[in-house]
Amino acid sequence: DSSTSRGLGDVYKRQSHINPSREEDSSHLNDLAAVGLTFVFIVGLRRAIRTLNLFPEITEPSLKQYLDLVALGTVCDVVQLKGLNRAFVKEGIDIIAKRQRPGIEGLRSISNTSDIGVTELGFRIGPRINAAGRTGASDLGYRLLTSQSEDEVMAISERLNNLNQQRQNIEQTVLFEATNIVEDEIIEKKLNIMPNSIVVSGEKWHLGVLGI
């Protein structure tokens, strides 16, 4: 296929691509982050299993316990906090406040975060988890959020904190170099009017921070 021909290797092939903003969509779910959409799907799946009367054979899971993760993902995806997104985040923050997930507590401790709200999730907790993926250690976030071991949680939290500092340093270096390139270009071409957009590149710039 096209991805193979372009040397991209194995790429997950989706069966379909659906624009969530289609005019005929009446689900009112088009503003959900992927984590919220996944949660809605799981709720529907549980309902279907209940309809098939399978829960007498297996324990019906309580899904509310996962709303802390839904809230975290929703805030970090920077979607509009209205409707179902707002409800997810409110319920999730209430759960986080009860200190039930060791991984989140580890990050709260390492980042000196006492109060918890949208700002703390978006600027203290989330960036430390995301730093792992941006610096090539994406499994750390999963391990942290699923671990019940205090020692493992603190070890991973410290590593994520260090990776976040590393990410910030890399980001500042890239920004500094990009700014210098732009300034040199303006001087060289004697531009009096700034163009609408400027594209710069660097061979050694870390791909993990270019989207920030």
Residue ranges and their predicted role:
Residues 1-12:
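Single conserved hydrophobic/aromatic residue that forms the stacking wall/gate
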Residues 47-212:
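Hydrophobic helix-and-loop "lid/oligomerization" segment in the mid-to-C-terminal part
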Residues 13-54, 67-70:
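Short alpha-helices
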Residues 10, 25, 206-209:
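Flexible loop/turn segments at secondary-structure boundaries
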Residues 8-9, 35, 104:
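A generic alpha-helix preference that emphasizes hydrophobic side chains
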Residues 8-9, 31, 171:
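Generic alpha-helix initiation/capping and coil-helix boundary signal
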Residues 1, 27-31, 167:
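Alpha-helix initiation/capping motif
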Residues 6, 43, 78:
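Catalytic PLP-binding core of fold-type I/II PLP enzymes
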